[in-house]
Amino acid sequence: MKIHILPIEIINKIAAGEILEKPANAVKELVENAIDAGSTSIKVELEEVGRNLIRVTDNGVGISREDLPLAIEKHATSKLNTKDLYDISYLGFRGEALHSIAITSEMKIASCFNGEGYVIDAQTKEVKPHHIKCGTLVEVRKLFHNIPNKLRFLRSEKTELSSIIELLNRLALVNPNIAFELISNGRQVFDYQTATQLKRMEQLKVLGKEFVENMIHVKHTNDGIFGELFLGLPTLTQKRNNCLIFVNGRPVKDSVISSVMRHAYNDYIPKNTYPIAVIFIRVHNNEVDVNIHPNKSEVKFRDPQVIRRFLLSVSSRSLLQCGRSTSTTVADRAVEQFNQLLKKQTAFRKETVSKTTESGFFQSPKAKKAIDQSQEYAKQFEGKRNLDFDQMQNNNGPFHFSTDQSEEALPLMSHKKTSEDYSNKLPLEKQQSPSIFLHDNRDTSFLQQQLRKINHCEHLQNEKHFETFGKFKCQVHGTFIITETENEMIIIDQHAAHERILYEQMKKSITSPGQNLLTAEFVPLSEKAVEILSFNVEKLKEIGLVVERVSHCAVMVNSLPEAFKNVPTNELIEDIASLLEEEIEPKTLLERIHANIACKRAIKANHNLTREEIEELLTLMEDIPHTGQCNHGRPTHIRLPRKEIEKLFLRS
């Protein structure tokens, strides 16, 4: 087969195919042109997700009549000259986009410059006067009509529209000073008005409402780098590495920044999850190369280590400040689960009452009289339930409170009440009438109420109040600790909290040198484990662990780090051999070992604690950083606002 030169038409279509893979690419190029033109308002209209129509309208500076024919020529641009190649400040610069779109569609461009409007047909190159009064309007019809192969590879309308929405959201996110509107098949998808950066994030909900409510916002400048970071709390994670990254106003994918952010969160989130973050970086244009990808979606930093150090420093310090914070999504999920449970219980009660009514239980005259009387008492009681004990004593109303002392039981008692506990509390005839409606023994009841009030006050004087976690109230199921503040109830997972405390305490000893053992310890292992340890002898020495191979299935341990002195050596060495299979750095290895030890040594569920032990745990949670999540990224506590609890009981 002879070599021949391709026709220019085929060459152009091949080149256009590299730039335009799908409708979203065409939308991207047109919207970026509008941004570069200084627009403050951009409107995108679609029909059949761009296959039939893409119309982009802006209020930018416009294109003059003389420049309109040049705008659709290949490599024609107003944004770049020879000496600017390494100082690119615009989103578009190659002069390829409009030419590629013109080749693959039927395109018209109308623009107003200095009060004069003109339109050009990209196919005929004819320029005519136009009524446009401001900015530029680009209309693209029948995209890919002359490249059938492209049409065949387009995905469903829903998928293609999602790509366009994601693209526009990212451009809107980094340009909050520009209003964006998207209309698809005559339906408005979104309309974002100009806003501050934070307000724009709330408008977009790109990462969800939860992210906006559970993030750390930090700005920092150093070494010619400006960074604005929105970092999700450690308990807010995702399964994909999908941080939103913007460099010099350009949405990009960058492996350096992504890896830095994962490393910054390494100490706080589970192994196979990723942080949620939005990163804005600005550097001098000659410090970053944006001309390495056809769609300009990747960049290359001149000195990536400088960027790495900057981001790692800023994000690490910011995460330190979040301390005991845990995301509100945890509480939201809890309230949602409570609501679901409440619906089920309410449905069950309605069904039970319905069946009881049908059985004729409430049909007897005595039953009806009792119900009427109860309702009358309830009306009198309503509005008086906030009275104190003295007011109640002087009131002539037909009620007083029960003197049942069961609710004053010690908080740490875990005795499970049975039906016998309740049935034996009162004689049968007393059980048949609610204590709230009793009329007799008023004086005795009042005396008992006052005694309870005095005892309760003495008990309150002994209660310890914690700044963050309020007052300790009780332990539930030997697993959860309940505290309360003025406006919240807090549920603490004692194992998760203690695990994090132990881990943070052990981290302080990371730099401690290894200690020689008085007697070297012989540890039998599998052949594979011995091979792994032998291969990593030098790495282990860096963390103060000295091991020596003595056979194909055993090692001798001569020195251990201080933090491991109370850990069974054979168990420790087995864990280390397992971790070393991942080829991790010494510092990360030590952190993983500490995390494993902390998990094993922390107090377990179903373990009753004394008040003193619980108060000590709460004190440590207040004093030690990062107690908002355990070593695996799970929350150590959730906060249920009082208002949400009241809603569960329909008190709102």
From Swiss-Prot:
One of the GO BP terms on file: mismatch repair
Record GO terms (molecular function): ATP binding; ATP hydrolysis activity; ATP-dependent DNA damage sensor activity; mismatched DNA binding
This protein's record includes keyword RNA-binding: no
Cellular compartments per GO CC: mismatch repair complex
Assigned keywords, A-Z: DNA damage, DNA repair
A Pfam family that the UniProt record links to this protein: HATPase_c_3
InterPro entries attached to this UniProt entry: DNA_mismatch_repair_CS, DNA_mismatch_repair_MutL, DNA_mismatch_S5_2-like, HATPase_C_sf, MutL/Mlh/PMS, MutL/Mlh/Pms-like, MutL_C, MutL_C_dimsub
UniProt-listed PROSITE patterns: DNA_MISMATCH_REPAIR_1 (PS00058)
PANTHER family on file: DNA MISMATCH REPAIR PROTEIN MLH, PMS, MUTL, DNA MISMATCH REPAIR PROTEIN MLH1
Function: This protein is involved in the repair of mismatches in DNA. It is required for dam-dependent methyl-directed DNA mismatch repair. May act as a 'molecular matchmaker', a protein that promotes the formation of a stable complex between two or more DNA-binding proteins in an ATP-dependent manner without itself being part of a final effector complex.
Family the UniProt entry places it in: Belongs to the DNA mismatch repair MutL/HexB family.
Protein name per its UniProtKB record: DNA mismatch repair protein MutL
Species: Neorickettsia sennetsu (strain ATCC VR-367 / Miyayama)
Organism placement in taxonomy: Bacteria, Pseudomonadati, Pseudomonadota, Alphaproteobacteria, Rickettsiales
